């Protein structure tokens, strides 16, 4: 049946494919209007989604030698067969899954044979029948009624075949052979799970023989934006005798209508302009005698001028995210509801832009981004990252092997064409990207030129120019921006933004790698974006964690990542790197991005005079939002008032005197909350868009002491222990060997029964991946405290136990050395004071502080510090200072791969309680704290969230500080300013047991 094989021939990308065209589904005259929610509700479309008979073969040879093509098992289309028990589930980042031997692929090439029946009720020779596949990975052959129809590859491209001469009235049979690997595999080495199958819609279009095949829509604006032109051109037609164009405005009113020409220019006066802030759409109808093509049109103009990115004459910033097609239960298959949920979260998170990493999405997605309002960088299905792994790790000298090899020219240009031609009429697409991580060379030069020839109204992006051979001259004139991924803020400013010779805008196509507890350096990037006009923004890596849901445990999904499926090659949990979980529950990092992208922000403040800036591009602030001011006084009381806005134009700042609107007497702080004025499709009225806080004076806690300052203190000793009794109700036992507080007895109840610990270890975050081995080698993980000597000092108010200590581990010198002093006061308060020096030859510390182990019943938590999310030196812009309440169980977020989470810095008060007894921590200086039911050992060694088991203890950590989070899982090293790298540590706080 397979007479010719094309999947190992770089010159053959497809066989019998119809010329690529703009995407549309033609309706018949008299049918209801086309809308993406009901896109197949036309007699012109026969949807072939559903159950197909399916047979899996481990190799093409097995398929060819198997005469009995069984029709017993079925597989849903669209789907990926890997999630239905066939083949291997595999996650890879950069490595090729097959030997690098282009154009050849392994003989053991898994394949799936699909077949089903379909019916044509009224076959009419006056019509043509076109078979469409919107996405098949990676290559496929197709037959109708046992006749070969054609072949195609490019997984994320639309393939359309003319089957008019092969179908008949009544029942027909379709067969599709899908190959896992083809020569296209060398161009599809994206960072993702490697699935296979028919993963997007399949349908047949009934086409009138007199028809429009392809058309192009472009919009242009006058300089004053008071007039627009919509240019419509029929680029290819079939037997076309006449055509009518009709244009309707967003209210459904006809603007104009014209007949009889193949192109037309609509003049629109006082146009409604499309942007992410106001995604209004006109409707264009292209009518022939038997068909109606509907195209939504957003009137907008894209330009690059003065190293800036302009939409409708306004310089805008890209506040974007990279967005793979990934779902924990369906893999590559993304439905309308999946897209809508993601776009809803993006809108709620103040994102305005999406990069379709790293391939075009289905047309449905672009129809939705047109309607809901996003700036889209649409990317070609090209990635050859595996070439840097051919001769060792990250050998970038080999990055250009494919990009500069003429054998791949046809394939690369074909992929660029396939990414532009079907999608050219979507208004939300504001730039094209030639691909991802594929180096640079003559093929990319030609690809960029081809892209410009297809569409010169949108800028072209490609990051790979960075890796070009600097000894050769390449034409970069068709690449319209300078793009980088994961440079440090310092490198960006020094190399690009402060360079007077910069001749193109600068963009980050990937940054702030959001893996695990992250990102920790977002604010530094955003500061530069706002500071420099030429820094037009970026796309966070990435939107969602990639993981496979394999079941449920205790009502929570079980997620699995690379290496969990017995793969020979894999890249572990590197796929778990999004700002939302696989099931779209937002990570804390999501709220960091939301806050950084807030539409109104505080840019300066002097006493009660503040300066706010409207970050919106087109809407006056007062029409979009209002400001709610929450004032907290020094006693903890709160009042709420509204601060009026007026004539607050986009990209302008206004000075407001808070004292005109709030009570400033005895003020502690004020939080300015920016709230939406009205309901929109994804957000409700009063939805909080972001906030700013001004702290004038922190509140202090007035401690209530159970003991009198005159209470007697009694000290007794054994060989190992020092016992300090305060009156008859409190007893503290200290260990002479390690300077720990070994137990606390309060009113004959044991509060602490395990030694406190001096901690410098944290369960490594994903961003600690490049430093954690240095930490472990230096003995940080299992560090212990060694007491050299001690002394007991008594005075009228307290007894002080002064321990001279060193923090040590086998085979390494002491990391820290100095004194820890326990001051036992007559009122029952313990004061803990550290005065330590650090070995500066050792790596910077993960953390430093005291750990307490309490009974599990200590569950309720109150604190005065930064919340409600985790906060670290460089992560926590979504937080604010306030009184917060939570539980130990709910503190922080447990990541798919467990790691450090749940710390709260800038704290001065913590209370943890079992409902009766309390442990209270206070300090005049801020500290960090964390509390959990999982030990550091368990969090460090457990590889999956569902394997964690809550322990019968509550762990409370009081930290001088932790090192920052950063984004070094893929980005720059942690900024030195956020490393716990002190030579000297002085730390003091109070412990009280009530």
Swiss-Prot record:
Entry superkingdom: Bacteria
Keywords tagged on the record: Glycosidase, Hydrolase
Keyword Signal recorded: no
Active site positions, chain numbering: 437 (proton donor), 510 (nucleophile)
Record GO biological process: lactose catabolic process
A Pfam family recorded for this sequence: Bgal_small_N
Catalyzed chemical reaction(s): Hydrolysis of terminal non-reducing beta-D-galactose residues in beta-D-galactosides
GO molecular function: beta-galactosidase activity; carbohydrate binding
GO cellular component labels: beta-galactosidase complex
Key word Hydrolase present: yes
Family: Belongs to the glycosyl hydrolase 2 family.
PANTHER family: BETA-GALACTOSIDASE
Protein name: Beta-galactosidase
């Amino acid at each position: 049946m397979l007479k010719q094989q094309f999947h190992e021939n770089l010159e053959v990308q497809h066989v019998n494919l119809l010329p690529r065209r703009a995407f549309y589904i033609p309706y018949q005259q008299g049918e209801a209007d086309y809308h993406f929610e009901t896109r197949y509700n036309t007699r012109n479309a026969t949807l072939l989604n559903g159950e197909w008979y399916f047979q899996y073969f481990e190799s093409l040879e097995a398929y060819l030698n198997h005469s009995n093509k069984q029709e017993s098992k079925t597989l849903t289309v669209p789907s990926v067969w890997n999630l239905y028990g066939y083949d291997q589930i595999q996650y890879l980042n950069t490595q090729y899954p097959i030997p690098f031997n282009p154009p050849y692929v392994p003989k053991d090439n898994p394949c799936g044979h699909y077949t089903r029946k379909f019916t044509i009720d009224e076959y009419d020779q006056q019509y043509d029948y076109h078979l469409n596949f919107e996405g098949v990975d990676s290559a496929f052959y197709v037959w109708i009624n046992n006749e070969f129809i054609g072949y195609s590859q490019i997984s994320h491209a639309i393939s359309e075949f003319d089957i008019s001469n092969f179908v008949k009235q009544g029942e027909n049979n379709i067969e599709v052979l899908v190959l896992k690997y083809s020569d296209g595999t060398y161009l599809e080495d994206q960072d993702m799970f490697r699935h296979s199958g028919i993963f997007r819609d399949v349908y047949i279009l009934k086409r009138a023989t007199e028809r429009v095949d392809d058309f192009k829509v472009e919009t242009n604006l006058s300089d004053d934006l008071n007039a627009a032109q919509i240019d419509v051109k029929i680029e290819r037609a079939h037997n076309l005798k006449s055509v009518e164009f009709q244009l309707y405005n967003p209210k459904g009113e006809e603007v104009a209508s014209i007949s009889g020409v193949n192109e037309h220019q609509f003049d629109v006066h006082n146009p409604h302009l499309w942007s992410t802030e106001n995604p209004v759409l006109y409707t264009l109808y292209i009518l022939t005698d038997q068909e109606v093509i509907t195209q939504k049109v957003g009137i907008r103009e894209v330009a690059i001028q003065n190293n800036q990115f302009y939409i409708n004459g306004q310089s805008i910033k890209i506040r974007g995210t990279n967005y793979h097609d990934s779902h924990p239960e369906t893999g590559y298959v993304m439905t309308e509801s999946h897209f809508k949920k993601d776009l809803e979260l993006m809108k709620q998170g103040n994102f305005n832009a999406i990069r379709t990493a790293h391939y075009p999405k289905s047309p449905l997605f672009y129809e939705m981004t047109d309607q809901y309002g996003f700036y889209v960088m649409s990317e070609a299905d090209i990635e050859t990252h595996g070439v840097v792994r051919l001769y060792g790790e990250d050998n970038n000298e080999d990055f250009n092997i494919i990009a500069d090899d003429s054998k791949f020219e046809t394939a690369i240009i074909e992929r660029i064409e396939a990414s532009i031609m079907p999608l050219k009429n979507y208004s939300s697409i504001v730039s094209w990207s030639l691909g991802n991580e594929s180096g640079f060379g003559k093929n990319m030069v030609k690809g960029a030129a081809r892209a410009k020839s297809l569409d010169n109204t949108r800028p072209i992006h490609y990051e790979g120019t960075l890796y070009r051979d600097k000894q050769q001259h390449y034409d970069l004139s068709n690449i319209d921006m300078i793009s980088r991924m994961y440079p440090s803020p310092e490198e960006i400013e020094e190399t690009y933004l402060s360079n007077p010779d910069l001749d193109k805008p600068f963009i980050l196509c990937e940054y702030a790698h959001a893996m695990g507890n992250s990102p920790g350096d977002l604010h530094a990037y955003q500061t530069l974006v706002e500071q420099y006009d030429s820094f037009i923004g970026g796309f966070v890596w990435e939107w969602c964690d990639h993981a496979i849901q394999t079941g449920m445990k205790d009502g929570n999904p079980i997620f699995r990542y690379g290496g969990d499926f017995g793969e020979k090659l894999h890249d572990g949990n590197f796929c778990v790197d999004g700002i939302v979980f696989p099931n779209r529950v937002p990570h804390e990092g999501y709220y960091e991005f939301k806050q950084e992208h807030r539409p109104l922000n505080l840019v300066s403040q002097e006493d009660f005079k503040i300066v706010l800036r409207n970050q919106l591009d087109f809407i006056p602030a007062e029409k979009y939002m209002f400001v709610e001011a929450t004032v907290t006084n020094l006693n903890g009381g709160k009042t709420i008032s509204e601060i009026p806005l007026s004539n607050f134009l986009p990209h302008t700042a206004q000075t407001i005197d808070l004292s005109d609107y709030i009570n400033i007497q005895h003020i502690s702080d004020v939080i300015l909350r920016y709230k939406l004025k009205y309901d929109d499709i994804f957000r409700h009225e009063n939805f909080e868009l972001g906030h700013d806080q001004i702290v004038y004076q922190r509140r202090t806690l007035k401690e209530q002491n159970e003991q009198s300052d005159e209470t007697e203190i009694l000290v007794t000793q054994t060989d190992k222990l020092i016992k300090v009794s305060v009156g008859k109700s409190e007893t503290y036992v200290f260990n002479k060997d390690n300077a720990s507080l070994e137990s606390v007895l309060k009113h004959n109840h044991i509060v602490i029964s395990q030694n406190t610990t001096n901690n410098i270890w944290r369960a490594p975050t994903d961003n600690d991946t490049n430093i954690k081995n240095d930490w472990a080698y230096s003995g940080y993980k299992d560090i212990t405290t060694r007491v050299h000597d001690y002394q007991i000092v008594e005075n009228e108010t307290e007894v002080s136990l002064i321990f001279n200590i060193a923090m040590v581990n086998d085979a390494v010198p002491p990391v820290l050395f100095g004194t820890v002093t326990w001051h036992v006061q007559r009122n029952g308060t313990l004061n803990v004071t550290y005065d330590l020096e650090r070995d500066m030859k050792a790596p910077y510390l993960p953390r430093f502080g005291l750990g307490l182990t309490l009974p599990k019943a200590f569950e309720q938590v109150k604190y005065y510090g930064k919340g409600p999310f985790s906060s670290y030196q460089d992560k926590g812009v979504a937080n604010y200072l306030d009184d917060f309440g939570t539980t130990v169980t709910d503190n922080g977020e447990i990541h798919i791969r467990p790691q450090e989470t749940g710390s709260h810095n800038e704290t001065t008060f913590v209370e943890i309680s079992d409902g009766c007894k309390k442990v209270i921590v206070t300090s005049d200086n801020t500290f960090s704290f964390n509390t959990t039911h999982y030990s550091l050992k368990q969090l460090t060694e457990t590889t999956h969230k569902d394997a964690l088991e809550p322990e019968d203890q509550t762990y409370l950590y009081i930290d001088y500080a932790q090192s920052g989070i950063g984004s070094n899982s893929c980005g720059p090293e942690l900024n030195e300013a956020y490393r716990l790298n002190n030579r000297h540590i002085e730390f003091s706080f109070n412990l009280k047991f009530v």
